[in-house]
Amino acid sequence: MNNKVNTRDFIVVKGARENNLKNVDIDIPKNKFVVMTGLSGSGKSSLAFDTIYAEGQRRYLESLSSYARQFLGGNEKPDVDSIEGLSPAISIDQKTTSHNPRSTVGTVTEIYDYLRLLFSRIGKPYCPNGHGLISTLSIKQMIDTVYENKEESKIQILSPIISQEKGTFKNKIEELKRQGYLRLRIDGNIYSLDDEIELEKTKKHNIDILIDRIILNNDTVTRSRIYDAIEKSVKEANGKVIVLVDDKELFFSQNHACNECGFSIPELEPRFFSFNSPVGACKSCNGIGFNFLPDTAKIVPDPSLSIKEGAIAYFRSVMMTPTMDLKREMSVWKEHDINLDVPFKELSKKEKNIIFYGDEDIGELKIDVNEQSIYSSSSFLYNNGLVNLIMRRFSETQSERAREYYEKFMSNLSCPSCNGQKLSIEALSVKINNKNIIDLTEKNINDLTNFFIELELNETDRNIAHLALKEIVDRLSFLENVGLNYLTLSRSASTLSGGESQRIRLATQIGSSLTGVLYVLDEPSIGLHQKDNEKLIETLKKMRDLGNTLIVVEHDEDTIRASDYLIDIGPKAGDFGGEVVAAGTVSEVSENKKSITAQYLSGKLKIEVPSKRRHGNGKTIELVGASGNNLKNVTVSFPLNKLIAVTGVSGSGKSTLINETLIKGIEKKLTNPFIVPAPFKDIKGLKNVDKIIKVSQDPIGRTPRSNPATYVSVFDDIRDLFANTKEAKARGFQKGRFSFNVSGGRCENCSGDGLIKIEMHFLPDVFVKCESCNGKKYNQETLQVLYKGKSIYDVLEMSVVEARDFFYEIPEIKRKLDLMVEVGIDYLKLGTSSTHLSGGEAQRIKLAKYLQKRATGKTIYVLDEPTTGLHIHDIAKLITVLNRIVDNGDTVIVVEHNLDLIKCADYVIDLGPDGGINGGQLVAYGTPEEIIEKKAVSYTGLFLEKNMYKDK
């Protein structure tokens, strides 16, 4: 009997042992929508990404030449016996698409490429000086325009060969003389080529060849002379002609050029509209859209102070003993009678401009360089102002410390030349339906789709553009279908959340219409409101229906229930996971008694709605008039000593309200005057807060040496313990001996890494276990010091829960490890490198550290989507931890979409009603029950009701 699985229908994995996987065998059906779920850290990603996708990628790389492989890396075979039936694999994970400021939603999705093509084919250039449509002219059309003037007019036909260029142009003038030309018009004056012409090298010049002088008559000879002269001018000046008719000057061009002012643009081609090409980019900012410049908001961070009180932060430390720079500035302020004793905000606009940008018309002022008096007798020529002064000092200094000081007063500010639009004035002059290409990229996806659907074109343009238009509209609709209708194409890719980046790549893949591909996705529902979840699920099904296999690592219940096949990894996390607990349809898995996921799916386990909501301490923080990004003058109160959930559809303004306005606004007032929050009018109730802490999902350390034990400071206590053993004292070992970061106790062969990097040149670098320490990071003498039979390396290899039991009798160590267990990271090894931690794990490690601190009752903790990467069982633990912080007297604000967390909040602030320009309003606020009452206007209320009362 042949039990071999047909690899045409299944991906057959045998003996997967990557990370914590325990010799996993699994048959995954092809051309199905497969979801892998399980507790956080159970091994889902190890199976999906580190095993199945990694092997698919390795096989592809193996097919390339060794020369190509050296540039790609990453062809190490995963720890698995075999994988059969594997298709070409594409990973769509949560990593931010790009940190390059040039990368935007438009470039990542390739929609901008089609826009560039569209504008180069049917775009119409307009004069930026208000002279209307620019068109190309034939020589006949030029002559016809000349003949619109009265007969007997004196006309001169000139060829503009040099326009606003520096130089003496001696060689050019000599060449024109040899060609037989007699006269030139230089900077408006006529010169004979027989004259000695001397031009200033540093000055910009205009040089025109005088081709012919003619009396305008409507006879054949005159018309022929005009034709010949214009034709010659066109050849010499690359299509341009100037015709002087009496005192009137006419400008003509065979290229795109304005007849009135001469503004011209080159032939339209796609790269002309690229801010990544020198041809199209703004020359001032090189296509980035911003420049690093002095920021008036940082120079004067607190305008309620007077200048004498230190309003100007740049001079704050020298107000009592003025420096030369300050003396110069104050001399100018005195000249303009600027009052140094009134609050800076009460100065007039003109006075502020003088302070920031100087007064070039003021001439010479006197100052004494030797005395403390600020009004004096030595003269200097003034033209600075603080902005110019700081910019000059920043540009000229060679000192790194000085540069860091000047940078405190500088920001990336919108480029004044292109107003942040990245392109040259010529490219921005080309329009379709009165909109330039950047105008279109600044529309949200919804509005942009409608613009192209409703676009009216003549038959010729429609025939030219229909293919490009179809691609644009199709790709925009794919973005809408994954819930990104609030984004703009101009949005920088580096500002996108992990979930947004992943869904953009998802939309791009749909646009490619590939078939027979294995897609591996990591929680595509992250950051997505329940309102848009159905669209996302339909998109995933559409990818499956194209003939692809989808393996989706996911915790979202709706996505799990929509799957064709469900694989539950567990039963728990870390060393207690790594097994396939259940596999089959959702209904089959739901009946599995060993699966924690099954217990939640069947309703046997669930996160209960709290029996009562906390009333708080009666104090509030009120944010008044928040108007950053799409926020529409929002005023909102945050009741303190409560668990507050800030909700709303994707793009409604939650992150702007909390991360960019509330956090930065409070930090500016309390700790960092140089920080620049999004615009708001006021924050009331600051006396009720001593600090605000953002518990982000950023890594806990920048190097692989950082680990959970060092971050929560428990490793310090453990090293103290080892240093106090009899063996350590006998050998004279101090606490530092047990650190793998400094010389002494660490293995010097691998510098405490445990691994040695071997460069393979034409192959990827290989990391091998250090032979000196056998991968244990420490030298032999250090490892001989034991505590209860375990070395310091053995302790780092323990899981948190194992370490807690091991150090049960040491209260300080046990207390810190108890907190790590409480936040749900009991499965992590103490020595796990920070680079191997997920964002959710990093966030929970930070929570464990903050829980060590004594509550003040005045601290606000902010978490942005803390349920990212968490199984519902882990979310229950997280809610317990957040409740503990609030019960201790502090306040917790979570920006969240997860309904199980939202329903456990004491207070909900719901923004909306939709995303982008259709969001940014306070839709509802109050308890979850009060939000449900507003379900007619609140999408959150609508879905919250379904979640809270689904059993009723």
Swiss-Prot record:
Keyword Cell membrane: no
Keyword annotations from UniProtKB, A to Z: ATP-binding, Cytoplasm, DNA damage, DNA excision, DNA repair, DNA-binding, Excision nuclease, Metal-binding, Nucleotide-binding, Repeat, SOS response, Zinc, Zinc-finger
GO biological process, one term: nucleotide-excision repair
SUPFAM superfamilies, sorted: P-loop containing nucleoside triphosphate hydrolases (SSF52540)
PROSITE patterns the record matches: ABC_TRANSPORTER_1, ABC_TRANSPORTER_2
Ranges where the ABC transporter domain occurs: 315-596, 616-945
Zinc finger (C4-type): 258-285, 747-773
Domain of life of the organism encoding this protein: Bacteria
Gene Ontology CC terms: cytoplasm; excinuclease repair complex
MF terms (GO), sorted A to Z: ATP binding; ATP hydrolysis activity; DNA binding; excinuclease ABC activity; zinc ion binding
InterPro entries associated with the record: ABC_transporter-like_ATP-bd, ABC_transporter-like_CS, ATP_grasp_subdomain_1, P-loop_NTPase, UvrA, UvrA_DNA-bd, UvrA_inter
UniProt key word DNA-binding: yes
Cystine bridges: none
Positions contributing to ATP binding: 38-45, 648-655
UniProt xrefs under CDD domains: ABC_UvrA_I, ABC_UvrA_II
Localisation per UniProt entry: Cytoplasm
HAMAP family documented for this protein: UvrA
Function: The UvrABC repair system catalyzes the recognition and processing of DNA lesions. UvrA is an ATPase and a DNA-binding protein. A damage recognition complex composed of 2 UvrA and 2 UvrB subunits scans DNA for abnormalities. When the presence of a lesion has been verified by UvrB, the UvrA molecules dissociate.
Summary of subunit composition and partner proteins: Forms a heterotetramer with UvrB during the search for lesions.
Record family assignment: Belongs to the ABC transporter superfamily. UvrA family.
Protein name: UvrABC system protein A
Species, as recorded: Malacoplasma penetrans (strain HF-2)
Gene name in the database record: uvrA
